[in-house]
Amino acid sequence: MPQEIVFCKGGGCTAKLGPDLLSHVLAKLPRGEKDSNLLIGYDSCDDAAVYKISDDTAVVQTLDFFPPMVDDPYTFGQIAAANALSDIYAMGGTVKTALNIVCFPEKMDLNILGKIMQGGADKVIEAGGTLAGGHSIADSDVKYGLSVMGTVHPEHIYSNNTGQPSDVLILTKKLGVGLVCNANRVGEAPLGAIEDAVSSMTTLNKAASEISHAFDIHACTDVTGFSFLGHLSEMLNDDITALIDSISIPVITGALRCADEFFLTAAAQRNRNHVGDKVCFAKNIPFSMEEVLFDPQTSGGLLFAVKASEADAFLHELKAAGLPAAKVGRFVKRRDVPIYVN
């Protein structure tokens, strides 16, 4: 009989603290003396920290861990690792090293932990990185993830809020994994839904990031726990508004049905509360699509703002690599509402 791990109430990126609460806490942290080599820190909404160490090299640092959202230990390890590695790719970087972060009950079968860590190690190897160590503590619930270090040229960093009017928005993965995993937790996921979700969550964003280096990318982020609309809102600046074409959004098999059947998450509601007043939905947008756009993603895709004249060629290369990428909208000059969904 296969060994399984127990689902947690908030597995994957649904376990994140809400953005409002997090912003409140971070605002109170002391800044200390400004270091000119810290190119990106926690005072921005970017996906990782970036520290310049020479004229042609900067270190990219990130970490991510969470409870399980699937019952197979090896698959959970793969997903958790792919999710942690993604932040390096979102910054335009290359993965170098990773450290395990482990919380594990002392009375649980250690073979389960071994499978989780094997799944994570295999993804680090696939990313071209080296698993260099880690840290573990005894805990009441299973949690796993990675601290990851990568490198990027200081002049080629992808920031998330440097998009320009007329940029085309390209998303590299489907949305809706939170809805599907929530339905699967109670055995109600539609046929083929969890398989599609797992396939998406275990796919590295490495290929998408590497392909992007040949194009004029103005901004990038990865879509994770704060949802498509939450992370899109972090890409906005004073000069731009986002116009989203909901029909073009790639969606996980069965996710819209899961929304219609109210397999919703508290994290999605937090996302709606946080960013909902920045979004204008057209009257014909169904509730299920709204929920997909507010749905917390685990190991979600990259969202690129690319120069309009290069968008078609970029999308062609992404699709040629087997990615379910799509043009999902564009930036225009600032309007009354930050985000319009049509």
UniProtKB/Swiss-Prot annotation:
A GO biological process held by the record: selenocysteine biosynthetic process
Bound cofactor: record note: Binds 1 Mg(2+) ion per monomer.
Catalytic residues (positions): C13
UniProt: Mg(2+) binding residues: D47, D87, D222
Keywords carried by this UniProt record: ATP-binding, Kinase, Magnesium, Metal-binding, Nucleotide-binding, Selenium, Transferase
Entry's transmembrane regions: none
Enzyme class: transferase
Entry EC number(s): 2.7.9.3
Function: Synthesizes selenophosphate from selenide and ATP.
Name recorded for this polypeptide: Selenide, water dikinase
Organism: Agathobacter rectalis (strain ATCC 33656 / DSM 3377 / JCM 17463 / KCTC 5835 / VPI 0990)
